[in-house]
């Protein structure tokens, strides 16, 4: 009787399509894909992956999926492999195609939810690599709420040139430096050729590595898995271990919503602050929280920022990459230091079946001597977190600033207004931007773009031209995890819906103050009302297809830019 109950529990969902005489047609089709008589009582596990040679981030995911399916079969489960999409942020950056990046988060979530719900899967493993794979996967996982685990494809190793580590951001910055005459053609070409040596997601604490770190902190990935190199053997071992962990989750009936609590999100935000992670974490964690039914707000990010130091020296503003962090203890070491300081919730459940504190029991609570990737907790890079929530008459619903790696965290200057990224990029490369300017790029928000493009090309060009500490940039679009400088994104309400950013005119004085968390347009209320009365909403840029549909459905960036 015990064995029967266990088997019934393992196929707790799939028995709807495998059991009984009336399901003979279902079983007939399953036999055609490899099921045999003894398999219909087993758990059927969805293995969703985004294998693609579109991008090095995803080029090795199929191999990891093979390791997962093998481990599932060994554990007595039946894997069903299916694909989902990816859009390369790095390759589409600075082009019309970048409008599809954030859209792909929703497509990934919808596709995972659709397939695993439609096929009555008992559990789910998602293997992802590029930026939107992670939040898209976790949104789908949360909606389904079947036992699940996320497997990160792994980070790329750094490239090397003239004794320096390279990442993809090195190339974006080289564009500005070469355009400004500060770099030779030979150096420019060598940086391009050497920056990406193989498979894996972009190597600094950019968006992919930020989100993988957040997922490990939330308890939805195995310890140490978020900073492994994509090409090292331990990544394949970790993938197989994840499959075995999923089988235990089904046995114990541990669901994602048992793990993804408000406390788990607070742990994720705390780790993102400590490692100097991407602004995109704000948008994505809020969207995942929405899928979980967890009330997560911009105020939660600001509250946690104020108490959390940045003590990992990672790119884009720091020196090291994710594989360097892995070598000195990875996310578990960071979490143990935070736990000791009383900044983490140790009682949160994880996919190991144990709590955060139990997972970290044997992890040292101090950084290793002789390295400076992880600094002592009481000697951090910054005493407070680097992702600040700015409000003011230019962003009544809020905006997100990344304030690490800056000599100054405030600027007041004349607005240089552009209604698209392309217009701004042309001005930067044409040397029309000078120190003290505050660039405004608008109509790039979730609805207005549509798709909320990342502004890595203009921010990198600004840095390449030597203006990174003297020019501000404000946008209703997003920033890449590779962005740093005096930048404020996610300005809400966005221009397309008539937000104050739509009313800014060339030469208006704007004050960006990350110290007081204020974003102020120095124009009196009467003048703003006059401009508002004259403002006319622009025509939609797309009337058919996925971008048109997205623009109709998507909400404010201040609430995660969700579509449901």
From Swiss-Prot:
GO molecular function: 2 iron, 2 sulfur cluster binding; dihydroxy-acid dehydratase activity; magnesium ion binding
Claim: Hydrolase is one of the keywords in the record: no
Entry cofactors: [2Fe-2S] cluster; Mg(2+)
Annotated GO biological process: isoleucine biosynthetic process; L-valine biosynthetic process
Active site: 480 (proton acceptor)
Binding residue positions for [2Fe-2S] cluster: 57, 130, 202
Record has Amino-acid biosynthesis as a keyword: yes
EC number: 4.2.1.9
Biased composition (Basic residues): 1-10
Record field: catalytic activity: (2R)-2,3-dihydroxy-3-methylbutanoate = 3-methyl-2-oxobutanoate + H2O; (2R,3R)-2,3-dihydroxy-3-methylpentanoate = (S)-3-methyl-2-oxopentanoate + H2O
Pathway annotation: Amino-acid biosynthesis; L-isoleucine biosynthesis; L-isoleucine from 2-oxobutanoate: step 3/4; Amino-acid biosynthesis; L-valine biosynthesis; L-valine from pyruvate: step 3/4
Gene3D superfamilies (UniProt xref): IlvD/EDD C-terminal domain-like
Segments for region (Disordered): 1-23
A Pfam family annotated for this UniProt entry: ILV_EDD_C
Residues with the N6-carboxylysine modification: 132
Positions annotated to bind Mg(2+): 89, 131-132, 454
InterPro entries: DHAD_IlvD/Edd, Dihydro-acid_dehy_C, DihydroxyA_deHydtase, DiOHA_6PGluconate_deHydtase_CS, ILV_EDD_C, ILV_EDD_N, IlvD/EDD_N
Keywords: 2Fe-2S, Amino-acid biosynthesis, Branched-chain amino acid biosynthesis, Iron, Iron-sulfur, Lyase, Magnesium, Metal-binding
Cofactor detail note: Binds 1 [2Fe-2S] cluster per subunit. This cluster acts as a Lewis acid cofactor.
Subunit structure comment from the entry: Homodimer.
Family of this protein: Belongs to the IlvD/Edd family.
Biological function: Functions in the biosynthesis of branched-chain amino acids. Catalyzes the dehydration of (2R,3R)-2,3-dihydroxy-3-methylpentanoate (2,3-dihydroxy-3-methylvalerate) into 2-oxo-3-methylpentanoate (2-oxo-3-methylvalerate) and of (2R)-2,3-dihydroxy-3-methylbutanoate (2,3-dihydroxyisovalerate) into 2-oxo-3-methylbutanoate (2-oxoisovalerate), the penultimate precursor to L-isoleucine and L-valine, respectively.
Protein known as: Dihydroxy-acid dehydratase
Organism: Deinococcus geothermalis (strain DSM 11300 / CIP 105573 / AG-3a)
């Amino acid at each position: 009787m015990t064995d029967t109950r266990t088997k019934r529990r393992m196929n707790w969902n799939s028995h709807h399509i495998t059991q009984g005489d009336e399901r003979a047609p279902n079983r007939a089709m399953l036999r055609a894909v490899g099921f045999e008589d003894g398999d219909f009582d087993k758990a059927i596990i969805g293995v969703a992956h985004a294998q693609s040679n579109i991008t090095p981030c995803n080029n090795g995911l199929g191999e990891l999926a093979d390791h997962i399916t093998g481990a599932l079969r060994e554990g007595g489960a039946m894997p069903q492999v299916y694909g989902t999409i990816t859009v390369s942020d790095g390759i589409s950056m600075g082009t019309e195609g970048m409008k599809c990046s954030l859209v792909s988060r929703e497509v990934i979530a919808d596709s995972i939810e659709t397939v695993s719900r439609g096929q009555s899967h008992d559990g789910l493993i998602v293997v992802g690599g590029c930026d939107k794979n992670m939040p898209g996967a976790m949104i789908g996982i949360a909606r389904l709420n079947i036992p699940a685990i996320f497997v990160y494809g792994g980070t790329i190793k750094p490239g090397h040139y003239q004794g320096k580590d390279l990442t993809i951001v090195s190339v974006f910055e080289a564009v500005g430096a070469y355009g400004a005459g500060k770099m030779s053609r030979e150096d420019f070409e060598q940086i391009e050729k050497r920056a990406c040596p193989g498979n894996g997601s972009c190597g600094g604490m950019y968006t992919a590595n930020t989100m993988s770190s957040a997922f490990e902190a939330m308890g939805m990935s195995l310890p140490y898995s978020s900073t492994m190199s994509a090409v090292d053997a331990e990544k394949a071992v970790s993938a197989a271990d994840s499959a075995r962990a999923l089988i235990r989750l089904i046995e114990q009936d541990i669901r994602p919503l048992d793990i993804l609590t408000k406390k788990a999100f607070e742990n994720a935000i705390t780790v993102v602050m400590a490692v100097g992670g991407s602004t995109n974490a704000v948008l994505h964690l809020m969207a995942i929280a929405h899928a979980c039914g967890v009330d997560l707000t911009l105020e939660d990010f600001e509250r946690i920022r104020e108490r959390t130091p940045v003590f990992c020296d990672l790119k884009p503003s720091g020196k090291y990459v994710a594989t360097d962090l892995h070598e000195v203890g990875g996310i578990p070491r960071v979490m143990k230091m935070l736990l000791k300081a009383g900044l983490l919730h140790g009682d949160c459940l994880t996919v190991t079946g144990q709590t955060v504190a139990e997972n970290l029991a044997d992890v040292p609570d101090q950084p290793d001597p002789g390295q400076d990737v992880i600094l002592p907790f009481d000697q951090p890079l910054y005493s407070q977190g680097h992702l600040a929530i700015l409000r003011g008459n230019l962003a009544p619903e809020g905006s997100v600033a990344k304030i690490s790696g800056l000599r100054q965290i405030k600027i007041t200057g004349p607005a240089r207004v552009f209604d698209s990224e392309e217009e701004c990029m042309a001005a930067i490369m044409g040397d029309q931007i000078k120190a003290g300017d505050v660039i405004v790029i608008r109509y790039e928000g979730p609805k207005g773009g549509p798709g909320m493009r990342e502004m890595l090309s203009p921010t990198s060009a600004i840095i390449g031209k030597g203006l990174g500490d003297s020019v501000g940039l404000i946008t209703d679009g997003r920033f890449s995890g590779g962005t740093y400088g005096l930048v404020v994104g996610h300005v809400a309400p966005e221009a397309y819906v008539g937000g104050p950013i739509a009313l800014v005119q060339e030469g208006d004085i704007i004050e960006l103050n990350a110290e007081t968390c204020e974003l102020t347009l120095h124009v009196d209320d009467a003048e703003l009302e006059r401009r508002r009365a004259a403002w006319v909403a622009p025509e939609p840029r797309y009337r058919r297809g996925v971008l048109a549909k997205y623009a109709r459905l998507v909400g404010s960036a201040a609430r995660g830019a969700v579509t449901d």
